[in-house]
Structure formats: C-alpha cells, structure tokens
Amino acid sequence: MANNLLTPTAVTREALRIAHEKLSFIGTTERQYDDSFAQSGAKIGDSLSIRLPNKYTVRTGKTLQAQDTEETSVTLTVATQKGVDMNFSTKDLTTDIDDFSKRIIEPAMAVLCSNIESTMLDSVTKDIYNHVGTPGTLPTFAQINKAKAKLNQYLAPKDNNRHIQMESIDMAGQVDALKGLFQDSKEISKQYRDGVVGRTAGLNWVENERIYTHTNGSDITGITFDSVTAADGDSTLAITGASSAPSVGSIFTMADVYAVHPETKVAYPHLQQFVVTAATTSSLSF
C-alpha cells in the first residue's frame, strides 16, 4: 500500500490550530484579513497604513461653519519575523497527523507562541499611557473597575471584546478576593472548577504568564519640564534634573495638563497620563 504522506498544507493547518489555542493575548486582538497583502503586481511592502476615525467639532446656532476633513493614520510595520526551524525525516511524514502533531508540531508551536506573545506584550505595553492601581501590588476589584472606566472615558466600544490579562499568581488572588461576591452561576463555577475568573465587571479574564514587567529608571523624582520652550503639539520636551534617562514605557503626568473627553473636549478631573517613548537626561519624547 502506498504511503500516505503528510502535506505541508496539513502540517501548516495543524500548526495554526495549535497556535490559536496558545496565543492568550494575540488571540484577543483584531485579526481581520486585509486584502492589500494579496494584490498581484505592486505589493504594499512591509507597512500598512491604518486610517484613524475622523474628528469634527460641533457648531451652535444656524450659521454654517464648514470644516475641513483631515484624515490621519498610523502605520503598522511588519518588522519582526520569528520561526522554529527543525529537521524531520520522510518517515515522520508517514505518521498520523495526531502523532506528528504531538511529537513535533506542538512543542515547536509552544515555544514559538510563547516567544511571540512575550515580544508583543513587551512592545504594546510600553506604548500604553493609561494606568490605574499601585505598581507591584495585586489590583483590587475597585481598581479593575477604574481600568474599565478608563476605557469608557476614551470611548472604547462597550462590547464583549474587553479583556484583562493576569499572571496565575494574580489570578489566584482575584479568585480568592471575589469568591464571596455575587456571580452568575456559570461564571462562578469556573472559579471553583478551573481556578480562574470567567467574565466579571464587563471583562473577559485570561491567564497569561508572559505579562510584561516594567522597571522605571533609577531617577524618577526631581525631573522637571522646560515649560518655556514647550509649544502646542510638541511630542518632545526638554527636561532638567535627571541623573539618568527615564525608561521607555514609564508613565508620567504634567501639572495642570488634564485629560479631556475625546469628543466634547470637556476636561476630566484627573491629569492626563503620558508614556515615555524615548528619552535622554535632557529630553523626553512621548
């Protein structure tokens, strides 16, 4: 009887199936296919422009106040490629897909997915400027609700796509802290059977051991901004009093600079948070 060899397509599909199960964070992100990459002839290359929502102002009264439409975008760059390269024999390809998956594909995809998740979490976490709670301590249920409030304040959609990622130790603490509160019977069963919080406070709770841990620079006090040279629209400011450069990903505020509602422009009662994207001892970008 002729050998029934596993094809590259079968191996790839199995690898993707396993990857989908192991990508705790990436699995919650937008993965809509963009056919710009499928164009024949002129390709878009490694960069994809993502259009941002247009912003307008509201007039009061009957007089027309026409305004220009200025579309803005951000660029998504395919900058990092990762893979697990391995050798296997034609004999391996004659095995059943389940056996081949367990022996070869699954271990390879496990380490690849873990590396991809860690890289992505490190990257995106350093770009996030909204923060609640006390660093280094288990967030309380009230603080988690404050995080949800931050999403509301910046107009994040109120749907089932809101997720919270926690390491197992923190998840265990949350399960213990929430065990006495009212829960939907289906969700509370997950705490006792699986040791994880299901869907609570409008969030889907997910365990993830690759959470990025941020470390501030050695000098985080006494840094002041040069307000004399600052101008509207600046994303880099001169600083003084820094003995070492602030760490990329550190969050800071500026006196009298308040957060505002994105649409009404009415100021919130709290200061706007910013995140360091680049820094030296004399300047800081955000």
Please name every model-derived segment:
Residues 66-72, 76-78, 235, 252:
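Threonine/glycine-rich low-complexity segments that form extended coil/beta-edge repetitive scaffolds
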Residues 44-45, 158-160, 247-248, 270:
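Short, well-ordered loop/turn elements at secondary-structure boundaries
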Residues 1-74:
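N-terminal "assembly arms/tails" that initiate or stabilize quaternary assembly
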Residues 30-37, 143-151:
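Short alpha-helical segments and helix-capping/turn motifs at coil-helix boundaries
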Residues 50, 76-143, 152-170, 192-207:
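Long, contiguous amphipathic alpha-helices that act as assembly "spine/axial" helices in icosahedral shell
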Residues 173-286:
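Autoprocessing Asn-cyclization modules and mimics
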